[in-house]
A protein has these predicted regions:
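N-terminal beta-alpha supersecondary unit
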Residues: 6-75
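Surface "functional belts" at beta-alpha junctions
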Residues: 8-10, 33, 100-204, 233, ...
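Residues at secondary-structure transition points
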Residues: 41-49, 80, 84, 88, ...
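Stable alpha-helical structural segments in soluble proteins, enriched in small hydrophobic residues
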Residues: 57-61, 96, 114, 207-218
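Acyltransferase
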Residues: 200-248
Length: 248
């Protein structure tokens, strides 16, 4: 199924799906504004919760899925299993309804949302316009998936996997404050002790962070090929087998 092109801009009703981390999050938006949402921080229960959340949003709001204009999904990087589940459900909906698929980078959504709302997250004693924003998604051990954004929400360092050490981000920290956040930031706090290293409170991936980017992509015809789209895993999946247990 090839990507679908729209001839003209209009208000879009979009279902946003975020399953890249331990958070299972879904919302329904029109023109970027949230109409309904469901979210769980229980852990990786996406296979059980995702379709239930979607069905509840539709039923509780008397919403016919055929009214959807597109489905947006968080494309990663993040949990291999979580991404696979979210993308599979999103593609299934797009196939059955004949609507476009939108992919939103998980770190892009986190980084740009936080930069756009910087005064909510940056301490009052710090000039928010001089802060860099560094979302972190937990990988394994001291490794995180990360990127770097300026105060305008522009990406200045591409998405990458980094092993965090005491000198990580030093070229930026020596010049200006950097706000670290996301589910990978907590474990890095002991290593990143530079005076310019700031840490936000709990701020995890959520479908509500996708709204603006998904709506922009819809209006700019930035759609994926439903047949061939794959999540952005960044790294190959590694299954470990400790003793008699199999863990993903």
């Amino acid at each position: 199924m090839p990507a679908i092109l729209l001839k003209e801009k209009r208000m879009a009703t979009i279902l946003n799906i975020e399953t890249a981390t331990e958070v299972c999050s879904v919302n329904l938006t029109r023109d970027g504004e949230i109409l309904a949402e469901k979210e769980s921080h229980e852990g990786l229960n996406h296979s059980r919760l995702l379709t239930v959340f979607i069905d509840e949003i539709f039923r509780e709001n008397n919403f016919n899925p055929e009214q959807l204009d597109a489905v947006a999904v968080s494309k990663g990087p993040g949990s291999y299993t979580g991404l696979r589940i979210g993308v599979s459900v999103a593609k299934g909906l797009c196939y059955s309804l004949g609507i476009p698929l939108i992919a939103v980078g998980t770190l892009d959504a986190l980084g740009k949302y936080t930069a756009d709302h910087k005064n909510k997250f940056v301490p009052d004693s710090t000039d928010a316009d001089n802060v860099l924003f560094c979302p972190m998604i937990d990988a394994r051990r001291m490794e995180v998936y990360t990127a770097l954004f300026n105060a305008k929400g522009e990406k200045i360092e591409p998405v990458s996997a980094k092993i965090i050490e005491t000198n990580s981000f030093s070229k930026y920290l020596n010049r200006q404050p950097v706000l670290f956040f996301g589910n990978g930031a907590v474990k890095c706090k002991a290593a990143l002790t530079h005076p310019n290293a700031l840490f936000s409170g709990p701020l995890k991936a959520s479908a509500r962070f996708m709204n603006k980017l998904a709506d922009e992509k819809y209006n700019n015809n930035k759609f994926e090929d439903v047949a061939y789209f794959e999540p952005f895993y960044l790294k190959n999946f590694i299954a470990t087998v400790p003793k008699n247990k199999i863990l993903e």
